[in-house]
Swiss-Prot record:
Molecular function in Gene Ontology: proton-transporting ATP synthase activity, rotational mechanism; proton-transporting ATPase activity, rotational mechanism
Localization: Cell membrane
Name of this chain's protein: ATP synthase subunit b
Major place of residence: membrane
Coiled-coil parts of chain: none
The protein's role, per its UniProt record: F(1)F(0) ATP synthase produces ATP from ADP in the presence of a proton or sodium gradient. F-type ATPases consist of two structural domains, F(1) containing the extramembraneous catalytic core and F(0) containing the membrane proton channel, linked together by a central stalk and a peripheral stalk. During catalysis, ATP synthesis in the catalytic domain of F(1) is coupled via a rotary mechanism of the central stalk subunits to proton translocation.
Domain of life of the native organism: Bacteria
Record keywords: ATP synthesis, Cell membrane, CF(0), Hydrogen ion transport, Ion transport, Membrane, Transmembrane, Transmembrane helix, Transport
GO cellular component terms, A-Z: plasma membrane; proton-transporting ATP synthase complex
Species per Swiss-Prot/TrEMBL record: Lactobacillus delbrueckii subsp. bulgaricus (strain ATCC 11842 / DSM 20081 / BCRC 10696 / JCM 1002 / NBRC 13953 / NCIMB 11778 / NCTC 12712 / WDCM 00102 / Lb 14)
Membrane topology annotation: Single-pass membrane protein
Quaternary organization: F-type ATPases have 2 components, F(1) - the catalytic core - and F(0) - the membrane proton channel. F(1) has five subunits: alpha(3), beta(3), gamma(1), delta(1), epsilon(1). F(0) has three main subunits: a(1), b(2) and c(10-14). The alpha and beta chains form an alternating ring which encloses part of the gamma chain. F(1) is attached to F(0) by a central stalk formed by the gamma and epsilon chains, while a peripheral stalk is formed by the delta and b chains.
Length: 168
């Protein structure tokens, strides 16, 4: 087996190789001196921006979680408040209903008592008026009896006429 060079037709000389190495080294030094600093700065800025963006994203995620928890707590609190308001409204409605019923009962009782008192007063007034009329009639009958001396039959007729006059 014979070794064949890759570039069979090309002659590689050491001087050319050294020259290429020197030119490549000079080019590398020029790139390092002129371009490496700005490229390195650009890469560092990019790295810092990525870090800042990741930190901002984490911060935003934490804020979003906090807001979601606050909203959930507020919603739960709102539900509890709504339940409490409904409970209070029912309680107030029941109290108001009971109060209205008790006031109506008290008013009805007062009206009944007043009606009883009015009826008793009317009865008393009617009795007093009847007594006065009976007294007046008695006086009138007595005057007539005294004015004329009546027989028993005349007196009976006179009383009957008087009673008939009361009915009218």
């Amino acid at each position: 087996m014979e070794f064949q060079p890759v570039f069979a037709g090309a002659e590689i000389s050491i001087i050319n190789t050294l020259w290429y190495l020197i030119v490549f080294s000079i080019l590398l030094l020029a790139v390092k001196h002129y371009a490496w600093g700005p490229v390195k700065d650009m890469m560092e800025k990019r790295r810092q921006k990525v870090i800042d963006d990741l930190d901002q994203a984490a911060s935003d995620r934490k804020k979003a979680e906090t807001l979601a928890n606050e909203r959930e707590a507020a919603l739960k609190n709102s539900r509890q408040e709504a339940t409490q308001i409904l409970s209070d409204a029912k309680s107030n409605a029941q109290k108001t209903g009971k109060q209205i019923v008790s006031e109506a009962m008290a008013e009805a009782s007062a009206i009944r008592e007043k009606a009883k008192a009015d009826a008793a007063q009317a009865e008393t007034d009617a009795l007093n008026e009847a007594r006065e009329e009976v007294a007046d009639l008695s006086v009138t009958i007595a005057e007539k009896v005294i004015a004329k001396n009546l027989s028993a039959a005349d007196q009976k007729d006179l009383v009957d006429q008087f009673i008939k006059g009361l009915n009218d």
